[in-house]
């Protein structure tokens, strides 16, 4: 049986820990160890990842050293197979482009940001061109429905399968009924992080125009680190539109249970990034019956529509009545059947790893 090596090629602790926890706690108990146990991880602080006793972790201090180790393994054994989780490592793309890593050796789970081309500088534009070619030189991809469609517009010949990120969710919360307080101003969550792709200032202006200054807005901006200048820019813009009591900017990482309590109190989410991202937050909002606004350029709307979930689009006419109707529609959906919810996504992972390991055709 082929040993499948999982590659977390960029030091993104939050997402990497989610994947490792899922493999350690769930997949390692269900699938052969050759498909689930072996990981190569870029982690400057390997100890901070936490204990994962069911996994064999080979940690490297940065993206470059990890990529060199992956390339060495790929060249030493052309039967060796790798599963790239996300892929934010330029050296690995260049290795695929040059043939140091062969297409048949790699399966890639697209995380969204690694597929899209949002930066505008000429250096990024040149890299995007090379990366786009390299992204067609993999054996198979896995992604959301929307990202599969986006990817296959460029690389129609590469096999692609539906697979969802293993969002951290408590299935016990899926069936609960959350009553929304219809009295008083709405509470709106803006963005899923402090990343500029959330277009926070534009979102705040749109919310002010659509719902007025009396709504309460919450902006979780504890990630990424070293983002103080942008946070202050957003805060200043927000205070020009909303009172200090109605503007809450979260500048620290929030504990998971505390984050759930924040989401539970929301009436609407506002996410206008022009790509697929933030599925974890979207899933948690759906659990609590909270609809959200998405950009039409975010292909995840196709996954939502496939699951018969209400979709509100940025740029459409919105008011409180529209939001309350979306809440009503969301409350009527059988959330236990949503494909990208835990535990429904687990079977997809079982199929994906069999394909990636070459144990299924």
Swiss-Prot record:
It is a peripheral membrane protein. Catalyzes the synthesis of Und-PP-GlcNAc-ManNAcA-Fuc4NAc (Lipid III), the third lipid-linked intermediate involved in ECA synthesis. Belongs to the glycosyltransferase 56 family. This is TDP-N-acetylfucosamine:lipid II N-acetylfucosaminyltransferase. Its main location: membrane. The keyword Cell membrane applies. GO terms for cellular component: plasma membrane. One of its GO terms (molecular function) is 4-acetamido-4,6-dideoxy-D-galactose transferase activity. The keyword Cell membrane applies. Pathway: Bacterial outer membrane biogenesis; enterobacterial common antigen biosynthesis. It comes from the Bacteria. The gene is wecF. It is an enzyme of class 2 (transferase). It is found in: Cell inner membrane. Coiled coil: none annotated. InterPro entries: WecF. Keywords: Cell inner membrane, Cell membrane, Glycosyltransferase, Membrane, Transferase. Pfam families: Glyco_transf_56.
